[in-house]
Amino acid sequence: MSHLPNLDSTLEHCTVCPHQCGANRHVGVGRCGVSAQPVVASVCLHRGEEPPISGAVGICNVFFAGCNLRCAFCQNHQISRCGTVQPHWLTTYSDIANSIETCLRQGATAVGFVSPSHQVAQMLRIVAELHRRGLHPRIVYNSNGFDSPQTLRLLEGVVDVYLPAFKYADNALAHACSGVEHYVETATAALAEMYRQKGASLVLNDNDEAEFGLIVRHLVLPGHIDNSIAALRLLAERISPRLHVSLMAQYYPPDGLSLGGDLARPLRENEYAAVLAEYNAMGLRGWAQELSSAQHYRPNFESESPFNT
């Protein structure tokens, strides 16, 4: 874990994610709303990921609080827009590692860090604590895609599987929905770095669990099928036509958020069918969710068991 001193120092004038907000997170919070302290909203066994990620038992997912994006439709908005640390959240490396260890005892062989882009330094210290305990699970980096290539380079040899999202092929849409500039160029550069490290192959073990590779996710947004088709084409043309792509249909307007226009409604069958047809025509490898998935993936992070409510 020789990377740790370098990443800890980046929090003094934060450059961990592409915003490079410059905050001293040792004395305050960054644009993400998080200080140098780890803030984990949930550690749980999760079976809802892609088959080679979940495996037969499930993956131990570590859900970081805060986020470097502000997506208007965020399904995890209860934790991504954290203002107050909730009593059941974890804020010490010992407590986080204890919870992960409990999951691993239940049979999980991989740990997925969800929304890690702004807590990479903390993530590495969690991994170091696991290694100190003699635990060496596979590490999955499950991000929104708005990652710093410089930070990702420090993760080479630490992360086994990258699982980023690629949300937009349209910067105007990215700004309107996620409040971010230059998403397309930034996310494409991050994906290029992940691809440099992993290539297009997905290496599976004897249990059909991903041990090494890259899977890119794309969530289809209602009323924005042109964005989805453009995103798939961009992935094939600028990264690789042999990428493993997970096409997601689980969009729903989250409770508690005020959304206007098409984002206020579910995805329609004809919209998803149009994107799925393009996906199949391009010959991309991967997985496509059923449209009904929107009825099942509705976590409640006010509960200590967010996926069991």
Q: Which functions belong to the PLM regions below?
A:
Residues 1-68, 72-83, 302-304:
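N-terminal [4Fe-4S]-dependent radical SAM core
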Residues 1-29, 199-309:
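Auxiliary Fe-S-binding modules of radical SAM enzymes
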Residues 41-61, 95-115, 284-286:
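Short Fe-S-cluster ligation motifs
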Residues 66-77, 90-102:
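Short, compositionally biased "basic patch" segments
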Residues 72-76, 83-87, 123-126, 151-152:
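Short, conserved acidic/polar surface loops in the N-terminal third of protein domains
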Residues 78-88, 176-181, 259-266:
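Short glycine-enriched, charge-decorated loop/helix-capping segments at active-site entrances
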Residues 81-91, 110-115:
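Glycine-rich phosphate-binding "P-loop"
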Residues 97-261:
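Conserved AdoMet/S-adenosylmethionine-binding subsite of the radical SAM
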